[in-house]
A protein has these predicted regions:
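Short alpha-helical donor nucleotide-sugar binding micro-motif in glycosyltransferases
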Residues: 224-225, 232-237
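Aromatic "clamp/platform" in nucleotide-sugar-dependent glycosyltransferases that forms part
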Residues: 245
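Nucleotide-activated donor-binding/catalytic signature segment of Leloir-type glycosyltransferases, i.e.
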Residues: 207-228
């Protein structure tokens, strides 16, 4: 197959660690390894749109309307991964999809997607939770939705590295949904070692983080690291925590688990679907005590691994996930 990948414009600001971009790149490389052609669309380029078997768009936004509406007139084989990360009550979310007026060009991204339903052949969700928002929020037919789980990147796991008793976080520290203030508060209250890795923002944002940390010597802001350094941290950490207020999947948590970390993760949204039946700590992200006590339990847990690692490798390796993706793409031509 010949496939076009169109990434949401804001990804250009986010760097290599952007989850949506990472998801698309993992899929693209595996598709290419399996013999398919994947063009990563550049707005400055020129393309023969009719030549594509699939045009796959990533990321919900107002830009979708013109991109998909015009594009589907040239090539009808549009697939859309909206990436819906929300805890908004379903009734409220559904109401927002009706808020607009096409004749007056009054659009929200939710309204625009409802109008685009006829132009999209297939919607992809990463979890049943996300699929429910597509079906119940936008009124998309169940047979137009495929659930394709995300796969983890190939991170070097070194079993010879001795686990150290600290908790690791990886992500954009300045995003409110990542819930860093409560994670820091939990570390201060329960005195576990915490290492924060990722985008710490500008100097003003970093100063706010350091003000939250105060004189706590058990909390370290590391900031950006390269892939090799990240792999080392994954291999060293006993626990990985992602107590987000909302999260689609949390690829970094999957990566950490593959490297032998015990996992503490939000009980909201779709991430918990990836760990069903496994020994992970699900936490209420609004409860500092729940976060702190769960991390302490995970630091003491010596039985969750390596079973967790083995199960995730079996279920979410890139080859298996991309085979499901290919099956979904082929539905467009049946």
């Amino acid at each position: 197959m010949k496939i076009a990948y169109i990434m949401y414009p804001g990804a250009c600001y986010m760097g290599a660690g952007d989850g949506t971009k990472m998801q698309a790149e993992i899929w693209a490389r595996e598709l290419e390894r399996k013999g398919h052609i994947v063009d990563r669309i550049n707005p400055w380029g020129h393309y023969d749109w009719k030549s594509y078997d699939v045009v796959h768009v990533f990321g919900l936004g107002l830009w979708n309307y013109d991109m998909i509406h015009w594009g589907s007139g040239i090539n009808p084989n549009f697939v859309f991964s909206p990436i819906i990360d929300t805890n908004t009550p379903m009734w409220q979310y559904k109401l927002a999809t009706y808020s607009g007026c096409g004749k007056l060009r009054l659009y929200s991204q939710n309204y625009a997607l409802r109008q685009l339903k006829p132009d999209i052949k297939l919607f992809l969700a990463r979890t049943q939770y996300e699929a429910d928002y597509l079906q119940r929020g936008y009124g998309i037919q169940k047979d137009k939705i495929s659930i394709i789980p995300l796969s983890f990147r190939e991170i070097h796991y070194d079993s010879s590295i001795k686990k150290e008793p600290f908790c690791l976080f990886v992500g954009t520290m300045t995003q409110p949904r990542k819930n860093i203030p409560r994670l820091i508060e939990a570390a201060r209250k329960y005195h576990f070692p915490l290492k924060l890795v990722g985008n710490k923002g500008n100097s003003e944002s970093e100063n706010r983080l350091r003000a939250l940390i105060g004189d706590a010597s058990n909390i370290e802001i590391i900031g950006f690291v390269n892939d090799e350094e990240l792999a080392t941290l994954y291999n060293q950490a006993k626990v990985f925590a992602l107590p987000s207020l909302n999260e689609g999947v949390g690829l970094v948590a999957l990566e950490a688990a593959i490297c032998g970390c015990n996992i503490v993760i939000t009980n909201l949204g779709g991430p918990k679907e990836y760990y069903e039946g496994e020994s992970v700590e699900l936490v209420n992200p609004y409860d500092v005590d729940d976060i702190g006590k769960a991390i302490l339990r995970a630091l003491e847990n010596n039985t969750a691994q390596p079973q967790l690692r083995e199960t995730l490798i079996k279920n979410y390796n890139v080859s298996a996930c991309v085979d499901k993706l290919i099956d979904s793409y082929q539905l467009l031509h049946t």
